[in-house]
Design a protein with these regions (language model features):
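Conserved small/polar residues in nucleotide/adenosyl-binding loops
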Residues: 183-185
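ATP-dependent adenylation/nucleotidyltransferase module used to activate substrates
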Residues: 1-143, 148-151, 178-179
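Short, flexible loop segments at boundaries between secondary-structure elements
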Residues: 154-175
């Protein structure tokens, strides 16, 4: 638990430095089922216990439509943390692979997944979406943009989505993969 406490301290610092959470916010964590999003969920759950700006926490998973995905462990973790959990069923897999037959599906899939998340959240009045991007992801995005696009670019700690009114927040930007690997789920 000590590693989670130290990690939560980094998350808190990032949240405060970029004013990511306001009193009364409901923060939805986009949970893929991978370690990054699960650790973020755990850290924000811990943070809400003592953070001076009270906020509610929810978890949401976009089901892309692939067979064999089991989100039971995610549901169990959410229940143990007292966090409401929603599974959003989509046909993203069908659109990306069967209709569009994308050769490089990652970008389209990511955009569609974020669009589905933001639309679902704005329909419920939730204006904050926490994503599990960390420092190493930011560096990788910066380098890929430089090499493949010839420009200096990276995602921001807070990104406002004008169409839906949802703010995407990235509270783990002060922590890298090495710090994440110390936390046991």
């Amino acid at each position: 638990m000590n590693d989670l406490n130290a990690f939560t301290g980094l998350v808190r610092r990032c949240v405060e430095d970029y004013d990511m959470i306001a009193p009364g916010d409901t923060v939805a964590v986009g949970v893929s089922g991978g370690k990054d999003s699960l650790v973020l969920l755990m850290a924000l759950s811990e943070l809400r216990r003592y953070y001076p700006k009270p906020f509610a926490l929810e978890a949401i998973t976009v089901e892309l439509g692939f067979d064999g995905m089991d989100f039971t462990p995610v549901a169990e973790l959410c229940a143990s943390l007292g966090v409401p959990y929603t599974r959003l069923k989509t046909d993203i897999k069908e659109v990306v692979f069967d209709v569009r037959k994308e050769d490089n599906p990652c970008s389209l899939c990511a955009k569609m997944r974020r669009g589905a998340l933001c639309t679902a959240l704005s329909g419920r009045g939730i204006t904050k979406l926490a994503l599990g991007h960390h420092f190493d992801d930011a560096v990788e995005t910066f380098l890929l943009s430089l090499v493949y696009e010839g420009r200096i670019s990276c995602f921001q700690p807070v990104t406002h989505m004008t169409r839906t009114g949802v703010d995407q927040i990235r509270p783990m930007l002060y922590a890298g993969e090495g710090r994440l690997s110390l936390i046991h789920i």
